[in-house]
């Protein structure tokens, strides 16, 4: 029983180390290149491609990823508090925020419709 729990803990620590290692690599790449993409996004791409290439197995990352997903709601609490602290600024910029959200959604929807129309015409 204790041996199984200890083994689970080791797997979790390895998983978290892999995820944090990918994050560190992503942050390093972002700092060295100065690209405007966040280091966390680059890190997740590094992790994705290392899993795609078979360098990292899904089973190795799954315990840590499951833990993050299980407690994801707690990670949004600081963001929500920050929004409430700057609610007046959010209200002052409500129109541009809504316009960009609606406009961006329409652009994606129309682009997807054109692309699907093109693909369906190619098949027939």
Swiss-Prot record:
GO cellular component, one term: plasma membrane
Membrane topology annotation: Multi-pass membrane protein
Subcellular localization: Cell inner membrane
InterPro entries assigned to the protein according to its UniProt record, in alphabetical order: LrgA/CidA, Uncharacterised_UPF0299
Disulfide bonds: none
Pfam family, one: LrgA
Membrane spanning residue stretches: 6-26, 35-55, 72-92, 95-115
Keywords assigned by UniProt, alphabetized: Cell inner membrane, Cell membrane, Membrane, Transmembrane, Transmembrane helix
Family the UniProt entry places it in: Belongs to the UPF0299 family.
Official protein name in the record: UPF0299 membrane protein VIBHAR_02118
């Amino acid at each position: 029983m204790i041996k199984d729990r200890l083994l689970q803990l080791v797997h979790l620590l390895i998983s978290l180390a892999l995820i944090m290692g990918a994050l560190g690599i992503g942050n390093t790449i972002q700092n060295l290149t100065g690209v405007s993409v966040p280091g966390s996004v680059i890190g997740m791409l590094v992790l994705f491609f290392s899993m795609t290439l078979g360098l990292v197995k899904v089973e190795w990352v799954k315990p840590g990823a499951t833990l993050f997903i299980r407690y994801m709601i707690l990670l949004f609490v600081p963001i929500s508090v920050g929004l409430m602290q700057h609610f007046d600024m959010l209200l002052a910029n409500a129109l541009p925020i809504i316009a960009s959200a609606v406009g961006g959604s329409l652009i994606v929807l129309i682009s997807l419709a054109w692309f699907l129309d093109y693909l369906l015409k190619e098949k027939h």
